[in-house]
């Protein structure tokens, strides 16, 4: 009987361990900026909308990938931001809202949030990379698979972006980059 119970315990543990989703530790903009003051890190911000199919794919297939989630959690503060939502956000001494938000259109296209406009976001998904002082480094537009997003994560986490300043250097960087993500 003990062997049977032990077997089911181990099987249950194995299924739980292998069946779990890998989660990015998402936080609000304000939480990320406050965390930067205690321990400086760059911010990665996923600007999404509720109606956006590629946004849902990025969340499901990329941000829940074990390698991506682990790397983001170790190297960045991660913000998931609804670019058409109704939240009020205090950022860089300003308050950003969505004054034209229509609650009846919460599942479809809505008006753009002022924070998305501040960052110049007009396509979804857009992943923003911000430096340790919450200044925009670059937007990355569109859906990326884990191996495709990896180069962006690493070029910013390692500060290689500081030495890759021309298009030619970026092309060389891409040619020499070796993916480690699954």
Positions of predicted regions on the chain:
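Bacterial Sec-dependent N-terminal signal peptides
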Residues: 1-21
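Non-globular targeting/processing and membrane-anchoring segments
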Residues: 20-24, 37, 120, 131, ...
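Thiol-based oxidoreductase modules, predominantly thioredoxin-like and allied folds used
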Residues: 23-26, 65-107
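A short beta-strand-turn-helix
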Residues: 24-42, 72
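Loop/turn elements at helix/coil->beta-strand transitions in domains of secreted/extracellular proteins
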Residues: 39-43, 74-77, 124, 132-133
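Short active-site neighborhood of thiol/selenol oxidoreductases, capturing the structured segment around
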Residues: 39-56, 78
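Structural micro-motif
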Residues: 42, 97-105, 113-128
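Detector for the c-type heme attachment site
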Residues: 56-60, 130
